[in-house]
Amino acid sequence: MAPLKSLLLGASLATLALSTPLATDAENLYARQFGTGSTANELEQGSCKDVTLIFARGSTELGNMGTVIGPPLCDNLKSKLGSDKVACQGVGGQYSAGLVQNALPQNTDPGSISAAKQMFEEANSKCPNTKIVAGGYSQGSAVIDNAVQELSTTVKDQVKGVVLFGFTRNVQDHGQIPNYPKDDVKVYCAVGDLVCDDTLVVTAMHLTYGMDAGDAASFLAEKVQSSSSSTTSSSSDAASSSSAAGTSSSGLSGLSSFFGGL
């Protein structure tokens, strides 16, 4: 007998095959109205921005941003923070977004995880001052989940927030990303989306996450803004301490002169 996940994967393939034309039509309409299509390479091909969004699409989706949630998430984030402040980058390369990879132990394959990890590392090396946020949908949620876990401490500290839609590792990882701050992760699992329950059964609810784009963008924007406030506060505290130290040093210098330079 074939493993349960293999049987479910076959059923899901049929479901996704039927849904793809509808998703493509919706994506084309969205791109014409708002601008972001199924591919975005603003980190790789553009200049550094204050914020960089790294996104991994779901299985069988087009481009490197997909159609269901990637493009509207990008546009909503730009709307909240400023279109000139945000660079959107989809995960491509070795990440082919194939279906069979969902049945692997990490719900994706090592090459896909490596492709996402490289995007985070490129953001860090090319734009060391950018604030990184990330998102993933369906298999892409597993790609981002696993990639963030593998980041060095330096790069991971640059990641301010993550949103995961139709999280395929929701059960295994307890609704969070291991070894990453739980408060900086928001998981979206629609009622009736069985993918979030450790199955590979794709229902209609798995295709509804576009409606969460605004809320998810607000979450990421808040994480970016709160990290900026923390940085400003730390800088102010450091400046105050430096000023106080300078005053103390001046006083000691005066005493030193008075006593002949002890």
Swiss-Prot record:
Keywords: Disulfide bond, Hydrolase, Secreted, Serine esterase, Signal. GO terms for molecular function: cutinase activity. It holds the Pfam family Cutinase. Its EC number is 3.1.1.74. It catalyses: cutin + H2O = cutin monomers. It is found in: Secreted. It comes from Aspergillus niger (strain ATCC MYA-4892 / CBS 513.88 / FGSC A1513). The record marks S59, Q139 as: Transition state stabilizer. This is Probable cutinase 1. Residues 1-19 form the signal peptide.
